[in-house]
Amino acid sequence: MFTINAEVRKEQGKGASRRLRAANKFPAIIYGGEAAPVAIELDHDKLWNMQDKAEFYGEVVTLVIDGKEEKVKVQAVQRHAFKPKLTHIDFVRA
């Protein structure tokens, strides 16, 4: 099972997302279930190594956000067109 540390995003929008990517992070979102959607930021290098494994896409992933654990599944992954970079991930609550 995969465990990922995440932080709630303080800023949203194109400029904020670009600043995140420049800081070696990238935006993501958690949605589904009864709770409201949550915009988060993730560390790029840690996720890049995890996303190479097929199990990352099929198993339940644990996100640790501000000390609380949230069980999610990967719904969609967006990658840069020609650079080895993740640009966004959608998670759905499990």
UniProtKB/Swiss-Prot annotation:
GO biological process, alphabetically ordered: translation
Record function comment: This is one of the proteins that binds to the 5S RNA in the ribosome where it forms part of the central protuberance.
rRNA-binding as UniProt keyword: yes
Protein's organism: Klebsiella pneumoniae (strain 342)
Sorted UniProt keywords: Ribonucleoprotein, Ribosomal protein, RNA-binding, rRNA-binding
Protein name per the record: Large ribosomal subunit protein bL25
Entry's Gene Ontology cellular component terms: cytosolic large ribosomal subunit
Quaternary assembly: Part of the 50S ribosomal subunit; part of the 5S rRNA/L5/L18/L25 subcomplex. Contacts the 5S rRNA. Binds to the 5S rRNA independently of L5 and L18.
Family the entry assigns: Belongs to the bacterial ribosomal protein bL25 family.
Keyword Ribonucleoprotein: yes
NCBIfam families to which the protein is assigned, alphabetical: PRK05943.1
GO molecular function per UniProt: 5S rRNA binding; structural constituent of ribosome
Stored InterPro entries: Rbsml_bL25/Gln-tRNA_synth_N, Ribosomal_bL25/Gln-tRNA_synth, Ribosomal_bL25_short, Ribosomal_L25_dom, Ribosomal_uL5_bac-type
